[in-house]
Amino acid sequence: MNSVSAAERLKSFGDAGPVCNKSIIFPSRVVTLANSFEKKDRSWYVKSQIPTDLSIQVNDITFKAHKFPLISKCGYISSIELKPSTSENGYHLKLENFPGGADTFETILKFCYNLPLDLNPLNVAPLRCASEYLYMTEEFEAGNLISKTEAFITFVVLASWRDTLTVLRSCTNLSPWAENLQIVRRCCDLLAWKACNDNNIPEDVVDRNERCLYNDIATLDIDHFMRVITTMKARRAKPQITGKIIMKYADNFLPVINDDLEGIKGYGLGKNELQFSVNRGRMEESNSLGCQEHKETIESLVSVLPPQSGAVSCHFLLRMLKTSIVYSASPALISDLEKRVGMALEDANVCDLLIPNFKNEEQQERVRIFEFFLMHEQQQVLGKPSISKLLDNYLAEIAKDPYLPITKFQVLAEMLPENAWKCHDGLYRAIDMFLKTHPSLSDHDRRRLCKTMNCEKLSLDACLHAAQNDRLPLRTIVQINTQVLFSEQVKMRMMMQDKLPEKEEENSGGREDKRMSRDNEIIKTLKEELENVKKKMSELQSDYNELQQEYERLSSKQKSSHNWGLRWQKVKKSFQTKREDEETRERTRRRSSTGQRTSFRRRMSMS
């Protein structure tokens, strides 16, 4: 049945239509013919002494009733020409696409027979739509079903947000009737108004009621939920409230991303696995409809996210980004989420940044996220050390991936500007982990990777560890040793400067020559220390040069030994060839001599 009202259908008959029975006057006893109903198989029968004369089919259920009680209250039935039944006496009527189905029509049938009517939030919306379908207006009887259901919705349902939620849920299968009758709009407006006005309630009351209201709103179907959120935004609800409801809805209806991932390989990462594998083909074949529903839900939720920062957590944004990638959301939506994450990156953690890796460009999302952060916080990045710490921890995690190319690791390591790091200990730890996981890197790649690290920003403990780290290139080790010596020198100088004022105060009454001699001794000591540092530097440089020459000598020796081996094989082969030729000649000579002796013996025997 389309959404055309029963009144319009009545007018469409015109003068050429069937004769209406609205002028018939029914005795009061006619409408009290039925005391109850009974069901046999898939049919409902009215218990009455008068035989039924009307068969009404709703879906696959047939109702046996009397024509007059229905005509007296239903304008639609009174306006159409009833067709005689072919199987039995009376008339037959089939109601197509009846709102609420057979259960709702059973309630209406009881109402037409003046049996008690039980209106409640569960059945009032279907009854309101069905009464509109049958055109049960005041024109046919005062207090008809349209007015009763409308009054119940207005004065009972809309007075309670719990009843309003119940009615709104019952409207899911009543489209387009519930929309045209403004039932959905009124319910959504009431819920949005209630959610917005909870801000003015004291906090102790909000804690009890707010959670229930928000949780119940987050259980609606996606269409009605979007209507409520859109109305809340139009009423200028607080972004934190809107974001809280959206996050709750995602928890209820979107799957946890790990449930859709298979073949996880952690490579010793414990709980923070990096290597995700999504069996997309199997997922789409087994539940293609469910995947499409999840994709539409994601796109709907992202479209109504409040633009204000802090409305939703960075953890939630990264979760939505992961889910969007898994369910192949639109590139524009993924880009929007990346921008949102970039603006809230300071609140993220390493586990949130571990995005499913099933594409060829698995690191591009992380790179763009950091780029968006730098664009948004370009002036404030110095005051946010949490970002450099986050990147250090993230690099340490992805460095454990044996399939991660060095170029992608280096791009991420160079994302933040140099002044964003106060200390490079975390970066050193990540580089060391990468070198440990990728032992086959060439010396050139090792030097290139270590250039991203500033040795001057390493702590003393990190320098001492790096000085004994054989995974680092030799040049980096020399630089770190130099840095260690320089740091020790600076520390000693600072200690001397701290002690100098104390000594001056103690000996303030001493002679001027003693002060000068003490200063000269300090200067002499510092010069000796500086000479020692220079000497150690020259020793390290000479050691480095010797090692470099030894390496080159060994490399050239290996090449020369390899060439000598080839030449020796050639000489050996030539000697072997000559020897084989000599042996061949010797056999030929022996055979020829043997043949001559045989022929001589034959000649002697013949003679």
Swiss-Prot record:
Keywords for the protein's UniProt record, in alphabetical order: Coiled coil, Phosphoprotein, Ubl conjugation pathway
Protein name in the entry: BTB/POZ domain-containing protein DOT3
Phenotype upon gene inactivation: Defects in shoot and primary root growth and aberrant parallel venation pattern in juvenile leaves.
Pathway: Protein modification; protein ubiquitination
SUPFAM superfamilies referenced in this protein's UniProt entry, alphabetically: POZ domain
Phosphotyrosine modified-residue sites: 428
Family: Belongs to the NPH3 family.
Organism in which the protein naturally occurs: Arabidopsis thaliana
Comp. bias (Basic and acidic residues): 499-520, 577-586
Gene: DOT3
Keyword field contains Phosphoprotein: yes
Segments forming a coiled coil: 511-563
Function in brief: May act as a substrate-specific adapter of an E3 ubiquitin-protein ligase complex (CUL3-RBX1-BTB) which mediates the ubiquitination and subsequent proteasomal degradation of target proteins. Involved in leaf vasculature patterning.
Superkingdom, natural source: Eukaryota
Ranges where the NPH3 domain occurs: 211-487
Tissue distribution of the protein: Expressed in emerging leaf primordia.
Domain note: The BTB/POZ domain mediates the interaction with some component of ubiquitin ligase complexes.
